[in-house]
């Protein structure tokens, strides 16, 4: 056994580091593809207008990348709520020491497959859907307000 995995206070930081590491490659590839799609003429025009590197990034490149950043933030948010594999692989039958790694998806799995409490699992899954929907709509709302200004 790994000593870090038996410490209840280290469960959440370990899960965060593992989840970030797991999804970082995908997000970097998506951002690099979006950066390659930025037309060089915009950057050259900003350079000709006297904009420095920081201003070109803030006022030219980031607004062009805004849809990609919104996509990545929405998928990251959904992925953050759906953490199950990491907990199940690292801790097996229990969600960590003192149930310190209990996530909503692990709770749904436990209620549905181990305790056969189908109604509780369905209610928890529906609540998870509502929470994800709320935060996704909130992100779209903030994104559309930033576009207007």
What feature does the model see in each segment?
Residues 1-20, 85-101:
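Membrane-interfacial helix termini and adjacent extracytoplasmic/periplasmic loops
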Residues 9-16, 26, 30, 57, ...:
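The feature captures the transmembrane alpha-helix scaffold of multi-pass secondary transporters
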Residues 29-69, 147-149:
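Intracellular coupling helices
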Residues 32-40, 113-149:
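C-terminal transmembrane helix and the adjacent membrane-cytosol boundary/short C-terminal tail
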Residues 49-51, 95, 118:
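A short glycine-centered flexible hinge/capping loop motif at secondary-structure junctions
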């Amino acid at each position: 056994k790994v000593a870090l995995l038996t410490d209840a206070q280290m469960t959440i930081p370990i899960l965060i580091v593992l989840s970030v590491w797991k999804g970082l490659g995908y997000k970097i590839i998506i951002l690099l593809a979006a950066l390659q799609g930025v037309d060089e003429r915009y950057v050259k025009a900003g350079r000709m207008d006297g904009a420095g590197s920081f201003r070109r990034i803030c006022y030219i490149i980031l607004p062009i990348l805004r849809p990609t950043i919104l996509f990545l933030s929405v998928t990251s948010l959904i992925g953050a709520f759906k953490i199950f594999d990491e907990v199940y692989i690292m801790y097996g039958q229990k969600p960590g020491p003192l149930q310190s790694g209990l996530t909503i998806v692990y709770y749904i799995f436990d209620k549905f497959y181990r305790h056969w409490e189908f109604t509780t699992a369905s209610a928890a899954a529906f609540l998870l859907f509502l929470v994800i929907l709320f935060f996704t709509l909130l992100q779209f709302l903030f994104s559309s307000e930033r576009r207007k200004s």
